[in-house]
Swiss-Prot record:
Seems to be involved in pore-forming activity and may contribute to the unspecific permeability of the peroxisomal membrane. The chain crosses the membrane at residues 31-51, 76-96, 115-135, 174-194. Residues 1-30, 97-114 are cytoplasmic. Residues 52-75, 136-173 are peroxisomal. The gene is PXMP2. Interacts with PEX19 and SIVA1. Belongs to the peroxisomal membrane protein PXMP2/4 family. This is Peroxisomal membrane protein 2. It is found in: Peroxisome membrane. GO terms for cellular component: cytoplasm; cytosol; membrane; peroxisomal membrane; protein-containing complex. Keywords: Membrane, Peroxisome, Transmembrane, Transmembrane helix. Pfam families: Mpv17_PMP22.
Amino acid sequence: MAPAASRLRAEAGLGALPRRALAQYLLFLRLYPVLTKAATSGILSALGNFLAQMIEKKRKKENSRSLDVGGPLRYAVYGFFFTGPLSHFFYFFMEHWIPPEVPLAGLRRLLLDRLVFAPAFLMLFFLIMNFLEGKDASAFAAKMRGGFWPALRMNWRVWTPLQFININYVPLKFRVLFANLAALFWYAYLASLGK
């Protein structure tokens, strides 16, 4: 290992356990990129829902210790089967459809993400959550009528600067992770819409 890299890690304060965990994550990312991103998305999505429940409890000043275990489970399923894999392939194909050398590539990528991927992904979120919650088509239609546009407008406000950074400056293999970390708070917002 290069001395400069070792020194940088030491200065960053990474202990042995975080270094090993990071090395293991990078190895899995290289060997099993879709599965690693799916697992990461599932875990962080569940954590986002758990965070939403904790925020909701604090806001309502509830003292009960009970949590809706189904919420994090639904978000874990959605993150594992949809967010991780779909985001992986979207970022991968976007990199090939709009390579960095293309004029205005950053703007084109952002427009593709914001005007095509974001609305479709949000609609998919509402559909899958409706199914996982055991609700019928009329509940989905009501959620789309009442929650889709407010959620999409909030998505555009919150995610546009984050996605500009993610799409144009974050290395391809880390884009799903970057989005997942930001999504901790986004899923907390979406979960609060469901209440």
